A protein has these predicted regions:
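Surface-exposed strand-loop-strand hairpins of Gram-negative outer-membrane beta-barrel proteins
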Residues: 1-30
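Outer-membrane beta-barrel porins/channels
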Residues: 6-14, 33, 41-342
């Protein structure tokens, strides 16, 4: 809002139902994350893999008849990543190896947000739901190294993933008499991950990982006007923004695995993920407890079924419209993996 210009009043009754607006919401939605990859050994020491994955994603929906509908009703971010990774193995000593790791990715990113707009805002009108749709494509890369000692099932890996820059283009609909063209610059954050595993006894494996993600690089994402002179908006004028104000993300995992026989093995893990929220979002600290079972019916075929139960911490959510308190929440995840060797 401009200094000295009062904000329009926020009613306490839902414009769609006429009933009092709810002060309690359930914003999280279920979503799935597919991943497909294929690896080929070009030589004894050189191997490459192509993959498809969806690295970034979120889906929340608080509904229309809530106080938070003035900030955002539904928010959805989807991504697609088409990548290739290669590794080259170099002998080190009598039994060890060092691997050089590298890869590139082509990524697509789409964002959607809907928001309740009251009367008295720019362009006038009655209560209505405005929507933001944007998308773009970008390229990222990664590089790293690994040390392996197969005799002890030991492997240590360090990988750096670059940021992926996007110049998001799209429209805001139902705010003005005609759709408004908007633009914004944002980058998917860079990250560094260290993984380690080693045998600790016959058929027993210990594993751990630490990952840092530069989420603090994402603060407020402004969407500015592009070619909207028909409604009196100059180029570069901010129309809306997505205020996140993240802090750095840290993810720490520890676990243990056991091979029961030639066909069955399992693993148990504990993961702590430091929330990126600074009070503007609900991404608080997360504890996740996972179990996995691997079944290998034959030499060239294996399956993995894994599940996790997590505890998402409580917090307070503050933005320009409202202040909300939320309690601890239960989160669950389930994954199924199949691997075929040719």
């Amino acid at each position: 809002a401009n200094p000295g210009v009062p904000l329009p009043p926020i009613v306490l009754y839902g414009p769609d139902t006429g009933r009092p607006m709810s002060s309690s919401v359930d914003e999280g939605k279920t979503f799935w994350v597919p991943k497909v990859s294929a690896k080929y050994d070009l030589t004894d020491d050189l191997a490459c893999a192509v993959q498809y994955r969806e690295p970034w994603g979120i889906h929340t929906d608080v509904g229309l008849n809530t106080f938070r509908s003035y900030t955002a009703i539904e928010q959805k971010i989807t991504s697609r990543d088409f990548g290739i990774n290669c590794s080259y193995r170099i002998p080190v000593g009598e039994k060890g190896y060092f691997r050089i790791l590298g890869g590139v990715s082509y990524q697509e990113l789409k964002g959607y947000q809907s928001k309740l707009v009251p009367p008295g805002t720019p362009f006038g009108g009655t209560f209505r739901v405005a929507t933001l749709d944007v998308e773009d494509r970008g390229v990222g890369w990664r590089i790293g190294g690994a040390y392996e000692l197969p005799e002890y099932a030991l492997r240590a890996t360090l990988v750096y993933q670059s940021e992926v820059k996007y110049n998001l283009d799209g429209t805001i609909s139902n705010l003005a008499p005609i759709p408004l063209n908007v633009n914004s610059d944002v980058a998917a954050p860079q990250s560094v991950e260290f993984k380690f595993q080693t045998g600790i006894a016959p058929d027993w494996l210990a594993m751990a990982s630490v990952k840092w993600t530069d989420w603090k690089s994402i603060q407020s994402i402004a969407f500015t006007s592009v070619n909207n002179t028909a409604v009196g908006l100059p180029n570069g004028r901010k129309i809306t923004s997505l205020d996140l104000y993240y802090r750095d993300g840290w993810t720490i995992m520890g676990g243990i695995g056991h091979k029961f026989n030639e066909k069955w093995s399992g693993a148990a893990t504990v993961t702590w993920d430091r929330g990126t929220s600074t009070g503007w979002t609900s991404q608080t600290n997360l504890w996740l407890f996972g179990l996995a079972a691997d079944f290998k019916p034959q030499k060239h075929l294996s399956f993995r079924l894994a599940g996790a139960v997590g505890w998402l911490g409580s917090g307070t959510l503050k933005d320009t419209v409202s202040t909300s308190d939320f309690g601890n929440d239960l989160v669950t995840a389930l994954s199924l993996t199949a691997k075929v060797k040719f």
